[in-house]
Amino acid sequence: MTLTENHQDKQAESIIGQGSRLCISGLNAAATATVRQVIMELGAVATSFRPGADGIILPDNASGADRAEALAQGFVVFTVSELTRLARGAEEQRSAIEVGDKTLRILDIEIPRGSEKTASDSGRFKHLCLDRLFLTTARKAALAVRHGIPCMLEGETATAKTTAILWLAMLAGQNAVRVNLSGHTDTGELVGRFIPSTQTGENRPAWEFSEGYIPRALRNGWWVILDEVNLAEPQVLERLNPVLELPPTLVLTEHDGRRFGSGGGVPVSENFRLFGTMNPSEYAGRATLSPAFRDRWGIWGHIGKPSEPELLDMLRCLVTGESPAFVWEGVRWIPPRTEPVYPVLSNFPDLEVTLKSIASFHARISGAAGDNEAPASIGRVRRERYVFTRRTLLNAMRLIHENSNGASRLRGVAARVLAEIYIQRLADPADRAAALALLRATGLA
């Protein structure tokens, strides 16, 4: 009996695309690789372990006893064909991005395009993989733009939170201003302060008021990105509460009391938007946001770390320029092809196996460094844990590319670069030995 013929059908479809963990059982290596790709397209996570899994993937020729055993354990059961049917059975197939003269569409969200010549250089985005994780993040920002609601993106470092907003601004033709907050940020930087006068002449004043980023953005219709929000002091953030209201307002009590917005003398541009990014509060030095401040961010997105298959897709995209298609909300989305960054690497016969090993090593050492969900197995005596991010991986790929000239195989080059970028940054010899063991486990060392 197939999945569509039994009582599990609706239950099976309900767990797809919501971060479910699907255990692959009884498949050979080639079939496992194919199924992992399908699982990722569906927005789920592939695992080889049954504990903690939501569903089990069995071979098409699995026995009735195997299926019955999995059902008895409370799992939703798929065969390979059934899983593929769900992935390919989306009612609609659409391009993930559509750039028109007057509008921009990211997945299902359409926003107007402006005509600003932005400071964002499209070349800075050449390393992007337009996968499910990145595009759903950009969609969250586009949703905020469409409805004029302040948007906060929270996630681990180097998960492309700020990049997604800047990329969206570039495509939308909007001027975006990025403000890096810290414990030293004061209200003068954001709202304004008096500075020595720049005027000339005998009667020039000694001081003049210089508006901060927020008043200028309100007037000119800029998008403002407040980076690392929870590094700033609470009293600095609370000064922004009126700007986070709908509609935004601001009274310059620091100067002449002029009012931006409703009932004031300075109108707020309809293009003004406010974004924030932050790492989880468990990070060192991060403040806990007040309930009043947090509540004013009407759209809040939690951005996860890329999984090992997503890391592999990113590496492939750097070489081929192709981002993976994925199923989201019942639609199969097709990202556009981009210019490959390192196309010369495609000439190596061991490219695919090397990229898989690189992605596997990064995922393993990142996990060993620990996160908010799991303790560290390396760097345990340090006050701050080691961090290996997407940025680390991009640096490694750049060095692999630059050192590949004249090499006959890529694996040796990759092993040397990974040792240099990842292992040599570890201070403790025991940690370096543990990291080297992880590298050997991927077959690279």
Residues covered by each model-derived region:
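C-terminal regulatory/interaction module of P-loop NTP-utilizing enzymes
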Residues: 2, 89-445
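Low-complexity, compositionally biased segments
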Residues: 8-12, 57, 63, 69, ...
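Interaction modules related to DNA damage response and DNA replication/repair
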Residues: 9-85
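Defense-system signaling and execution modules centered on TIR/cGAS-STING-like, death/scaffold domains
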Residues: 1-11, 80-96
